[in-house]
């Protein structure tokens, strides 16, 4: 039996020229999740991270607070889908993140505003009608993540490793949970919108089957500082 901890990266730099880097708050979130692992894990886990900068930074900062010597196994299969490309196919302003950020700052409810764009963009992507317009189709992304998860489980069996921590993104974590629970695409992305930065979703791999133990844990962030709860 093995336990897999799926960690969403800390807050990235929304609206900046380079989204793929942690904000100052994101760096703090990563350190807090590292403190949590130091308190709860008795032995160094297998550590895996996507190759995106926000994944690597979150992993490095978390390990600096917990298991300093644990190597990070980098695997691009755990990377998020290209959200800027997917969203810009629906809303061209996503090609100019600084303009989108200005728009968001002007609305009364930024989360609802972005949620509407998110829902429309995802509906278009998962509908398959426009697959030829995307770098990676929804089915391609889903298959990539499910394969990465299965490969990890097989590796845990082969090495008899009891614990693994994977630093990734909300879309990836949603697909993994969807695989375990048998969810369809719309349900999967409903989960995605609720996952907080630096949260932990826990799976158990036992007897060739995956079980969901917890989803979107973030109590350690709230206990440290309620201002650390972010979704964007």
Locations of the language-model features?
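Active-site metal-binding loops of divalent metal-dependent hydrolases
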Residues: 10, 170-171, 216-219
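Generic beta-sheet signal
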Residues: 4, 45, 162-168
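Acidic, low-complexity terminal tails and accessory targeting/binding regions
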Residues: 2, 68, 79-109, 139, ...
